[in-house]
Amino acid sequence: MARRHGWQLPAHTFQVVAITVFFLLTVAYYAFFAPFLGNKLYEYIAIGVYSFLAFSVLVLYIRCTGIDPADPGIFVKADNTPAHKSQNSNYVPENASAIDGGPYIRHGSGCCSAIGRFICGCLVIQDCRRDTQQEQSNEQEEALFCSLCNAEVRMFSKHCRSCGKCVDGFDHHCRWLNNCVGQKNYISFVCLMAASFFWLIAEFGVGVTVFVRCFVDQKAMEHLITEKLGLGFSRPPFAAVVVVCTTLSLLALIPLGELFFFHMILIRKGITTYEYVVALRAQTEPLGTSVDELDQTSQYPSPASSAVTATSARSSLGLSIQYRGASLCTPPNIFVDQQDDVIQHLEPGPVRSTIDPDSLSQKKPPQRQQVRINPWKLAKLDSKEASKAAAKARASSSVLLPVSSRQNPYKTSSNVSGRSSPGRGKPADSESCSLSSPGLTRDHFNPMYMSSPANESPLNEEESRNAVVAARRNLPSSDESSVVWDPEAGRFVSLSRIPGTDVGGPLGNECLNTITSTGTDRSRRARGNPLTGYFQQVRSQRGDQLPVFMPTDSQLHRHLSTRFH
C-alpha cells in the first residue's frame, strides 16, 4: 500500500530520533543555556532569535513530512477523483460512506474547525514553482507508465520502494522525514535545512558561551545556578549537561551543514541527488554484461540456446535462412526447471583442493556500493554527464516503461519475439508460426514464415502458387534429397525416402501443392494423399521424440567419396 505522507505509521527510527533530539535541545536551551548568559539584554535577544528559528524548524519539518510528493497520476485512477482534488486529504468522494453504511457526514465545530482546517491546509499544500506549468506540458508529451503503480506518471518521476509510489521530480528518500523529497516539497526541504543549520549554530554558540562562563566566572555561575535551578544543582553537573547538549548540537551541525551545501551545489548545477548517485555509480562500478554477451558465454542449455530450437543453416531447398539465435518455434519447457540450479564451482577454471566446492555456491552476489554524499565530488561532476546517466538509467528501468509499452507489453527492440502465439481470428495460423526475423519475408518458400489465412483472396493464392512454381524450378535434380514441411507432423520430411515422391513426380507435386492450400483444402487433399498414412506411421514410431534429419544414401556416398578423393 502506498504511503500518503511521512506521518503515516509505521514511523521510521530516524524520524523518532530527529523529533526527540529537537525537543531535547529546545528544552535544554530554555532551561540551561539562555538564562545563564549573565545579561538580561543578551538573554532576551538569544531567546527571541532562538524561538523564531526553532518555530521555523518545527513548521517546516511538519510541512515537509506532511506534503504528499506523489505523482498526481497514481491516485487519480485508484480513487477516481480529479487530479486537483487527489492531493487534498479532506476531499471525500460523493459515493463515500461511513463504517455503518450510512452517508459520510462531516461534523465541525464552527469557527475553530475552519481555522484548524486552514492551518492544516497551509502546512500540507505543495510548494509553488514558477516552472511547474511548463514542465507539466513538456512531460505530458513524454509520459511513462509505472508497472508497479499501474498508472501513467511524468517523465522525471521515479518509483520509491520505501513509500510504494512514484514521486514527482524524485530527489531522494529522506529517512529523517520518513518521506520522499520531490518537486512538491523540495523548496520546503531546502528551507528546513537552512533553518535547522542556523538553529544549531545558535544552540552551539550559546552553549559554548555558557560552558566558558562556568570556569571563568565561577562565583557568578554558582549564584545563578542556585537562583534558577535550586540548591539541588551544583556547578559540575550543570557543566556536564551543557557539554552534552553542546556536543550533540555540534554532531548534528556538521553533517547537516555538509548536506545543506551539497544541495546548494545541486541547485547550482541543476541536477538532483538521484542523478548524482546514478552518475557516480556509472563511474565507479563496471558496466554490466550485455544480453548478446550473456547468450554467447552461456554454457548451460536453455530453450533459446538448445541445439534443437536454435537450428540455423541452409535448407536443402537452396533457400538461405538467416537469423540470430531465433528459434523456429517455442520448444517444450524442458530446461527451465533446472535452469536456476547452477553449481558455481563448475564454471571454467581450476578450483583449489583446499576449497569446499559446496561453499562456493553459498556466496551471495556482490552488492552495490553505497554512494555517500560528497560536495567535493559533486563540484567536480559534470552536470551534463549526470543528466545523461540518469536518462540512461530511466531508459533501462524495468519499472518505468514508455506509454507505448503498455499497449504491447511483449514488444521488444528485436524483430524476433520469444512469445509467439497463433492469432485468434485466423484458424489457419495455428498451423504456422507468426515469427518474423531479419531477412525473412512472405516470399520465402519456408512454410514457417508463410501463413495461409482462411480469408485469403484468390489473388494471393495464385501468387503463392506462382512462388511455389518458381521455387520448383530452382530445385535440385531428383537424385538429391528434397524436403517438404509436414504441417500435421510439425517437422520437415525428406521426399527421397519415400518411393515415388521424387521432385517433379505426382506425389512430390501433391506435397508442394498441399503446403499452399488453406485449412479446408489441406484436410480434404490429405485424405486422398498417400503421404498421409506415411506421416501418421512416422509419428507413431517417433512418439514424443524431437525430429531428427538423417542423410540419404546418395548424400552419404557423395560425402565419403569427397573425403577419400
Swiss-Prot record:
Compartments where found: Cell membrane
Species this chain originates from? Arabidopsis thaliana (Mouse-ear cress)
Taxonomic lineage: Eukaryota, Viridiplantae, Streptophyta, Embryophyta, Tracheophyta
Record's compositionally biased regions (Polar residues): 359-372, 404-420
Q: Which reaction does it catalyse?
A: L-cysteinyl-[protein] + hexadecanoyl-CoA = S-hexadecanoyl-L-cysteinyl-[protein] + CoA
The entry's protein name is Protein S-acyltransferase 21
Question: How is this protein situated with respect to the membrane?
Answer: Multi-pass membrane protein
What the record says about family reads: Belongs to the DHHC palmitoyltransferase family.
What Gene Ontology cellular-component terms does the record carry?
A: plasma membrane
**Domain comment quoted from the record:** The DHHC domain is required for palmitoyltransferase activity.
